[in-house]
């Protein structure tokens, strides 16, 4: 799958400078910000994967409407993600395979100043797991982070027993840096996380090999 010229992508907008929707491409996947009309597809995938995903995610608030069942809540979620993109705090994308919604990949917690870093988070439909789609999506947004957003470092934090997610890092050859104890509260438990790091220097050194394997 070929990509449009990446220099036209505006890092803080849902559209490019030419007015076209923001889309990023790998060999087999496309990623773009979710919009209100994605509700049915997003809701179906989230419901079908409830058990698969819940053990790796924070507990949902009982006091807020569930965006997987409430269209207005989903629309508000999209608006909030757009606002975060506009302010440069995070960049959220839906993953699409042959036009069908399959998961999400996000650049979260963007810090500028001396750090110039962000954290990548992701999830995928269990029916699509094991086919390297997520490795491709992580590389697509890493390229965007380094080349369009000008970030210096990306970090990915994974619960040690989440072997599927750690396999994503292994396929891309992203460095394991160590263990952060009781790092995030996941499903009601303060979980240790393995921290992985990927810097722009590593991206430049491995650009040709990674692009040929995953992007071109």
Feature locations, PLM:
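Conserved acetyl-CoA-binding loop-helix of GNAT-fold acetyltransferases
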Residues: 122-124, 130-147, 163-171
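Short, contiguous, well-ordered secondary-structure segments
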Residues: 105, 110, 134-138, 142-144, ...
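Conserved catalytic-core motifs of GNAT/GCN5-like acyltransferases
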Residues: 157, 175-192
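Conserved GNAT acetyl-CoA-binding A-motif
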Residues: 147-157
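A short coil/beta-turn micro-motif at the C-terminal edge
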Residues: 36, 160-162
